[in-house]
Amino acid sequence: MKIMGKKARNAALVLAVVSAEQKKHALEMIALSLESQADEILCANNQDLINAAQNNMAAAMIDRLKLDELRLCAMIDSVRQIACLPDPVGQVINAWTRPNGLHISCVRTPLGVIGIIYESRPNVTIDASCLCLKSGNAAILRGGSDSFHSAYALHSALAMGLEKAGLPTDAIQMVETTDRDAVGEMLKGLDGTIDVIIPRGGQSLVKRVQSDARVPVFAHLAGLCHIYIDQSANVEMARDIVLNAKLRRTGICGAVETVLIDRQALEKFLPVLIALQEKGCEIRATEDIVSLVPTFALACEEDWSQEYLDAILSVKTVEGVEGAIEHIVRYSSGHTESIIAEDVGVVEIFFNRLDSAILLHNASTQFADGGEFGFGAEIGIATGKMHARGPIGVEQLTSFQYQIRGNGQVRP
């Protein structure tokens, strides 16, 4: 593992000075390699799916693990989108000239070596690697046992693309073991060679990384997303948004888990909940809602802090936007919250009073995604307040330095 860290550090030194065109070319070669290796990748993924079924993996987790031709094509498109993004390295964030003539520039620089620890999502192998490459960083990947065959096949395509582009294959390395001791070694920083750790997975993984890591961590613990439906909301819009936010993909961190409805307009928005139930979603609601629709289940206290990642939704009535804010502040994981409303004043209160990483107005929480932000892809959603926050794209994978140019100045 420590040798891997040293190789990554040496590769990072090369990537830091590679031109934007070289990186773009490497990403284009990776996309071509993924296309040429498609059959092998899907075959490897099928082996992971067979193992998952034998291990009685939950349906939502199998959905995360699954690759098909459509998802693989989307993955390849994402690589090409990343290739076409502006290169963040060397961008001048700000610049000014002091009265003494010193010209100061704040310039983006790579972070260095990024360790990515993840579980069952094969796309993380590609998204993380390509975002790191675009931002001039080396990557060390440690996938989970559930996606081992998929990740290995995808990494082979990555290495092929790097080699064709003339870049060091050590720029993207994969830990080829499922031994958990490897995670522990990465969390220690591999003798100072890892600069940042990014975990992608369940709460147990993220908690371990956050508690044991000796290097900075970009992470979110849970995607407990809320939607507040104000009395001023359009019913049809609310229906479309909530159905999408819950059921488009139930197993992703941007799926809504709790819907809060303005108590003054409960009957107006009952059709939204009934439509969800008709689509197979279990509704767990407060007593006033269940009294109107007895086929709904009665919610308990634990439901408000539950990330279901399934076709289950908690629903509660609240006293307007103030009640919604009070509930969200108490239970939110700081990931994503949405408000459906036509009253601009209510929207401003919602935006100004909540401090989650992503806030939306009249839009599905499933837009909490780097690709939807125009980032090409993302490594994850960071809910901390230091450095990276929200979708982690190429800019969030850079640091900065101050470059100062003078003409002989000395300090008096």
From Swiss-Prot:
GO terms for molecular function: glutamate-5-semialdehyde dehydrogenase activity; NADP binding. Pathway: Amino-acid biosynthesis; L-proline biosynthesis; L-glutamate 5-semialdehyde from L-glutamate: step 2/2. Its EC number is 1.2.1.41. CDD domains: ALDH_F18-19_ProA-GPR. Pfam families: Aldedh (PF00171). It comes from the Bacteria. One of its GO terms (biological process) is L-proline biosynthetic process. It catalyses: L-glutamate 5-semialdehyde + phosphate + NADP(+) = L-glutamyl 5-phosphate + NADPH + H(+). Signal peptide: none annotated. Keywords: Amino-acid biosynthesis, Cytoplasm, NADP, Oxidoreductase, Proline biosynthesis. Transmembrane segments: none annotated. One of its GO terms (cellular component) is cytoplasm. It is found in: Cytoplasm. PANTHER family: DELTA-1-PYRROLINE-5-CARBOXYLATE SYNTHASE, GLUTAMATE SEMIALDEHYDE DEHYDROGENASE. Catalyzes the NADPH-dependent reduction of L-glutamate 5-phosphate into L-glutamate 5-semialdehyde and phosphate. The product spontaneously undergoes cyclization to form 1-pyrroline-5-carboxylate. HAMAP family: ProA (MF_00412). Belongs to the gamma-glutamyl phosphate reductase family. This is Gamma-glutamyl phosphate reductase. The gene is proA.
